């Protein structure tokens, strides 16, 4: 499953006894082909230069750093346990669960818990480069690779040539200018909080306030808060389980309304209140309005980022999906 990696559930046969506290089931994650810009990928410093078809992660340093991140998140009950790593992937805790569906994101209780989980995630202090270079650094790298791409198939080439008629460099310049004028705190971001990266844990009551778990931290980095929330709101629109080509469906009317956004923001801020201190009603209302502007401006960056990512994936990915 997923659009970047291959996932396999592995289990011991019933007649094989487990040794010590070893798990009987694990999740095997095999990294897919994904473009890795040097020094900005996943927020991990020190990555070596990567070619257009490299597999992540690159080098021992980045493997160690990503494993550290995964282990810290597991220790804080924000992610699955890590059982082992190897250059092409890792072994993770298998958690009985199901991934959320797109329509689940609109459920007020689920949206509330996602907001709380994201706020906790943003409150973490991680041992990584805290400068917010990931967003524009990665997009610049994608643009460079896109300028060198060639597609042998006529249908892909036609779509690619149409995309090139847009001045992507100018679009990014305008986007950068807009976001530089938009205050947004730098926090440790997941950067891909879509329904497929949120588990609904089996055996938890529907009314439980701790029934969800974020997974898939490959894009996590220090980044602007507005991007993480704005990107999540964009994901309300997309269903990636569509059975027919291009294997996704976009319903723009599902983008969260003002009230749905405020519902999310208020629960996000309620979890963050311990770090911010008490606020008056007027201050709370001002913060909410500022966040609405911040989030919806950074949602534009989400569209642009994943648009560039998708062009590159159309060239290098072996997963059957309508990237272009």
Please give the residue ranges for each predicted region.
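Catalytic activation segment of kinase domains across protein kinase-like and atypical kinase folds
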Residues: 199-247
């Amino acid at each position: 499953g997923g659009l970047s990696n291959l996932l396999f559930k592995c289990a011991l046969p019933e007649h094989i006894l487990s040794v010590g506290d070893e798990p009987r089931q694990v999740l095997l994650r095999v990294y897919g082909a994904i473009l890795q810009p040097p020094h900005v990928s996943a927020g991990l410093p020190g990555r070596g230069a990567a070619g257009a078809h490299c597999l992540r992660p690159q080098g021992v340093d980045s493997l160690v750093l990503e494993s550290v991140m995964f282990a810290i998140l597991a220790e804080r009950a924000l992610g699955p346990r890590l059982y082992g790593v190897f250059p092409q992937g890792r072994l993770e805790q298998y958690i009985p669960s199901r991934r959320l569906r797109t329509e689940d994101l609109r459920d007020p209780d689920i949206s509330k818990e996602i907001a709380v989980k994201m706020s906790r995630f943003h409150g973490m202090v991680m041992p990584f480069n805290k400068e917010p270079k990931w967003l524009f650094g990665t997009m610049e790298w994608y643009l460079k690779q896109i300028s060198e791409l060639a597609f042998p198939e006529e249908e892909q080439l036609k779509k690619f040539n149409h995309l090139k008629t847009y001045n992507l460099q100018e679009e990014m310049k305008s986007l950068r200018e807009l976001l530089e004028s938009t205050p947004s705190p730098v926090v440790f971001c997941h950067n891909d909080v879509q329904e497929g990266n949120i588990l609904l844990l089996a055996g938890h009551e529907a009314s439980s306030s701790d029934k969800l778990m974020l997974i898939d931290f490959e894009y996590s980095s220090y980044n602007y808060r507005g991007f993480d929330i704005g990107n999540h709101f964009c994901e309300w629109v997309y269903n990636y389980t569509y059975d027919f080509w291009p294997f996704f469906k976009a319903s723009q009317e599902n983008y969260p309304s003002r009230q749905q956004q405020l519902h999310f923001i208020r629960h996000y801020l309620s979890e963050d209140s311990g770090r911010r201190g008490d606020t008056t009603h007027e201050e709370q209302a001002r913060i909410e309005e500022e966040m609405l502007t911040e989030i919806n401006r950074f949602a534009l960056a989400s569209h642009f980022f994943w648009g560039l990512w998708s062009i590159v994936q159309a060239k290098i990915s072996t997963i059957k999906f309508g990237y272009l």
